[in-house]
Amino acid sequence: MAPGSWFSPLFITVITLGLQWPQEAATFPAMPLSNLFANAVLRAQHLHLLAAETYKEFERSYIPEDQRHTNKNSQAFCYSETIPAPTGKDDAQQKSDMELLRFSLVLIQSWLTPVQYLSKVFTNNLVFGTSDRVFEKLKDLEEGIQALMRELEDRSPRGPQLLKPTYDKFDIHLRNEDALLKNYGLLSCFKKDLHKVETYLKVMKCRRFGESNCTI
């Protein structure tokens, strides 16, 4: 059976997640800071989960099981590793809110071009529905982060200018093993970067609003 030619439960989950984007806050009008954070966290959670499930679906469809461990140890270097972004919750706690927002913005913007080619990675392009939808979700999150930065910029010192890393486009020639491994590595980076953004936003939201049930 050709890869991507049938619907696995995971595949259905990916499609469902793509449709369940929070509609109650399609834009970021003037609103309380707590609401801005809540909306941004919700968007980051959806994108991270979508990226994780898509990575798993790609792995299931194209990477033989006996090669997965080896490939994971040699996956592509992530451009996000070239900036001094925190790698986890404890590191993020040491950064100011504005620093975390700047890191988040750089990570999001580094994927705006590559994701426009993402639907061509799968033989069945119903994964993600269309690249445009993923692009729009990233743009929404970018807008939310920028709204938070506008709210906080007068209260925080301006940090150093960050270099903006960029990722290669996804390769659509899936019969080529090098292309498969390149896309596998890119999807891994996409998942890792969105996990970082989700973590940063949760750290900021939790320490600002002191939620007793806060989980990161």
UniProtKB/Swiss-Prot annotation:
Cystine crosslinks: C78-C189, C206-C214
Binding of Zn(2+), residues: H46, E198
InterPro entries in UniProt: 4_helix_cytokine-like_core (IPR009079), Somatotropin (IPR034975), Somatotropin/Prolactin (IPR001400), Somatotropin_CS (IPR018116)
Gene Ontology biological process terms in this record: animal organ development; growth hormone receptor signaling pathway; negative regulation of apoptotic process; negative regulation of gene expression; oviduct epithelium development; positive regulation of gene expression; positive regulation of growth; positive regulation of receptor signaling pathway via JAK-STAT
Gene Ontology molecular function: growth factor activity; growth hormone receptor binding; hormone activity; metal ion binding; receptor ligand activity
Cellular component terms per the entry's GO annotation: extracellular space
Signal peptide: 1-25
Family according to the record: Belongs to the somatotropin/prolactin family.
Its biological purpose: Growth hormone plays an important role in growth control.
Designated name of the protein: Somatotropin
Origin species: Anas platyrhynchos
